[in-house]
C-alpha cells in the first residue's frame, strides 16, 4: 500500500469480503482468528483507520471494537513499546501474536491519508500539497463527506498531479512524494518491520 519493502498488505476485498473498510475487517476477523488457530499464518497484523469520533468511530472506539473480538478469544494487549509508538501487540498463551495498527498514528483520530499528509516531502511536493488544499477549499460544490474525507481528497489530488498522474501511494513513496523519515511515517515503518521481519 505505501511501499515498505518486504511487507505485503492485503485488503479485506482480496480476502473474500465484499469490499474494504472497517465493517469488512470486523466481519473477517473471527475467520482470521480461526485460521491463526489452524496455523495458517506465521505473523498477523491488522491495519485500520481510526476515522473520527462522532463521524465514524475514532481511535478509542476503533481499538475497542477490535479488542471486543480479540480479548474474548484469549488475547491480551501488552504494554506499548516506547521505541515503537505505532501499534499494539496482543499475546495469546497458545497462538501467534496479533499486532494492531490504527492510522494515522495509533493515538489520534484520522486515517492513512492524515499520516501521509504529515509526511509529504518538503519542496515542490509540499507546494503542490498546499495548492491541493487551496483547490479543495475553493470547490464550488462538495460531493464528499468533508468531515471524513478532506485529507483523502487532498492526498488523492496530490497524487493526481504526479508523473504519471494518479500513482498509488507505494509508487509515490518510492518516488519521494512522502518523506519516510518524518516521525509518523517512520514510526509506522518501524512497526511494520517489527511485525513482519
Mark where each language-model region is.
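C-terminal accessory helical subdomains adjacent to catalytic cores in phosphodiester-
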Residues: 2-13, 23-197
Amino acid at each position: 500500500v505505501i511501499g515498505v519493502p518486504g511487507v505485503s498488505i492485503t485488503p479485506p476485498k482480496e480476502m473474500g469480503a465484499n469490499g474494504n473498510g472497517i465493517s469488512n475487517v470486523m466481519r473477517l476477523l473471527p475467520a482470521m482468528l480461526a485460521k491463526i488457530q489452524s496455523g495458517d499464518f506465521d505473523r498477523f497484523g491488522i491495519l485500520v483507520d481510526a476515522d473520527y469520533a462522532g463521524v465514524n468511530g475514532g481511535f478509542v472506539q476503533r481499538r475497542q471494537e477490535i479488542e471486543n473480538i480479540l480479548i474474548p478469544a484469549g488475547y491480551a494487549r501488552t504494554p506499548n513499546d516506547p521505541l515503537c509508538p505505532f501499534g499494539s501487540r496482543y499475546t495469546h498463551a497458545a497462538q501467534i501474536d496479533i499486532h494492531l495498527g490504527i492510522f494515522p498514528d495509533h493515538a489520534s483520530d484520522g486515517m492513512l491519508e492524515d499520516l501521509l499528509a504529515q509526511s509529504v516531502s518538503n519542496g515542490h511536493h509540499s507546494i503542490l500539497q498546499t495548492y491541493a488544499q487551496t483547490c479543495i477549499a475553493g470547490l464550488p460544490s462538495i460531493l464528499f463527506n468533508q468531515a471524513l474525507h478532506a485529507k483523502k481528497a487532498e492526498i488523492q489530488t496530490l497524487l493526481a498531479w504526479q508523473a504519471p498522474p494518479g500513482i498509488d501511494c507505494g509508487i509515490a513513496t518510492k518516488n519521494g512524494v512522502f518523506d519516510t523519515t518524518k516521525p509518523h511515517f517512520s514510526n509506522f515503518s518501524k512497526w511494520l518491520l517489527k511485525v513482519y521481519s
